[in-house]
Amino acid sequence: MAFHQFAPSSSLPIWSRVNNPFTPKTSIITSISKPKSKPKSNLKSRSKLRSRSRSSTCYPIQCIVIDNPSSTIINNSDRRSANYGPPIWSFDFVQSLPIQYKGESYTSRLNKLEKDVKRMLIGVENSLAQLELIDTIQRLGISYRFENEIISILKEKFTNNNNNPNPNYDLYATALQFRLLRQYGFEVPQEIFNNFKNHKTGEFKANISNDIMGALGLYEASFYGKKGESILDEARIFTTKCLKKYKLMSSSNNNNMTLISLLVNHALEMPLQWRITRSEAKWFIEEIYERKQDMNPTLLEFAKLDFNMVQSTYQEELKLLSRWWKDSKLGEKLPFVRDRLVECFLWQVGVRFEPQFSYFRIMDTKLYVLLTIIDDMHDIYGTLEELQLFTNALQRWDLKELDKLPDYMKSAFYFTYNFTNELAFDVLQEHGFVHIEYFKKLMVELCKHHLQEAKWFYSGYKPTLQEYVENGWLSVGGQVILMHAYFAFTNPVTKEALECLKDGHPNIVRHASIILRLADDLGTLSDEMKRGDVPKSIQCYMHDTGASEDEAREHIKYLISESWKEMNNEDGNINSFFSNEFVQVCQNLGRASQFIYQYGDGHASQNNLSKERVLGLIITPIPM
């Protein structure tokens, strides 16, 4: 695979554009000897839940155990408090969850249904009907079980039409095929939609507004557009107007919502490309597919059973994590930190939902806990002097620095050490590679950018939007999350990719992190301003331009849309040394961000909507 250099993003001018397993014992690894031969294991598909026991194979590890380190007391000035409430998902509640959909009888039934659906998918003779079935399977959340078959079908359709969608299709069929092909990395030209433009005016034909399914399909397809694809930009603007007009007319009828109306409202709220698979699957099963007259009972039963069985896997993982969290006593040692283990796990349902990735979800949840601790320490509790000391200690990776830290920071520092070393041990087993230096550098960079925001806050400095975003996409932790994901979903790892992740800030990581940062700002602004914080992107834009808050929010949404175009550029990019699987994780981080912060601060706040989302995706099965 060819390599290429990632240049700094050329989209910076848009910032100012007015338009649119920690254990209580602190065992710290200081060196790891590389094994002579690579152990045979599979990090990304390790689905057996572990209690952190290790195999009998041992590698030389030098450790330092510190009991009751000395503490230097730093003046305890009045500290800010976010007054985070206790978690609504208690340890006893999580441990009491019944694992309903486990066992041979469910597995046997699922396997039979899977074979039936596979025959159904392959046996469809009508080309459009086959595309519609693929779309339905995707929206039901079960396409991951038929990836090879779907790719084979789409590849055949692509090559049979000289690498273009079928020219004889109407708008609905053309948009559907375009979206599915783009989704799987096929280079489909946007010019196919010129067939639906008025050749005299160059605008989309007005009668498209009468074809709601066609307009809806074109709207969804437009969100697979890449930077500079003006036809798809025009399509999005045009179809948004069409769909909003239809929504207004439908709402005035005061009748029960039709399925088309539900689909239109759902799409206008957030397009398919930006939605997480599990949430979309639950909504589509319960609100759309069950109510369709042509619903296939086999397909519906399979989708429900798969959803519930995967949910049972999540419940097992969450039980393990809740025991880890309780045993760590971090909630007691760091009472100022958001105690949101279940919410940290909910992120993982958006990032990689498939049942075989249990290990990744467990470790990534612990990473989110670590990032939450560091975030709250910088944003809420730590003094500027303490935060500088913490960054220095992390940068030097020197235990002697701990004597300068207050006790609460020692706990945070030990957790960072232990978690980094646990990850390093697993990466060593999987890849025969010691990655501590890479992960450590990103953790130091993360804290430096957090420290910058703390300096802004204490000095009263108001950054420009460009200053804020250039610092904020690095302080939000996306690059740390995705470094972990790279090792989990890449084999073999390459030196070039690692150096790029560590130093080069690749475009896909940058823009996934920008979406994370900006979605966070949209959802948390009001709460963070109440407790006092550095100005967020919305306020920075208002200060830069004199815009109202509503105008600023629209501009931030526009920036998110522009970052999605940049990420779309990576789909099927043969010049990238990042795998399609890693690109998908980057995109899923963007999706999970928009899901968590869609209606407010879904990470910290525990309102009814946040509770319903946890219940729907992790706790309560879909009725069979």
UniProtKB/Swiss-Prot annotation:
Superkingdom of origin organism: Eukaryota
Positions of Mg(2+) 3 binding: D520, T524, E528
Residue positions binding Mg(2+) 2: D375, D379
Tissue specificity remark: Expressed in glandular trichomes two to four weeks after flowering onset.
Listed InterPro entries: Isoprenoid_synthase_dom_sf, Terpene_cyclase-like_1_C, Terpene_cyclase_plant_C1, Terpene_synth_N, Terpene_synth_N_sf, Terpene_synthase-like, Terpene_synthase_metal-bd, Terpenoid_cyclase/PrenylTrfase
Catalyzed reactions: (2E)-geranyl diphosphate = (4S)-limonene + diphosphate; (2E)-geranyl diphosphate = (1R,5R)-alpha-pinene + diphosphate; (2E)-geranyl diphosphate = sabinene + diphosphate
UniProt biased composition (Basic residues): 35-53
Keywords, alphabetical: Chloroplast, Lyase, Magnesium, Metal-binding, Plastid, Transit peptide
Residues covered by region (Disordered): 27-54
Known cofactor(s): Mg(2+); Mn(2+)
One of the record's GO molecular function terms: magnesium ion binding
Domains as described in the record: The Asp-Asp-Xaa-Xaa-Asp/Glu (DDXXD/E) motif is important for the catalytic activity, presumably through binding to Mg(2+).
Protein name: (-)-limonene synthase TPS1FN, chloroplastic
Annotated source species: Cannabis sativa
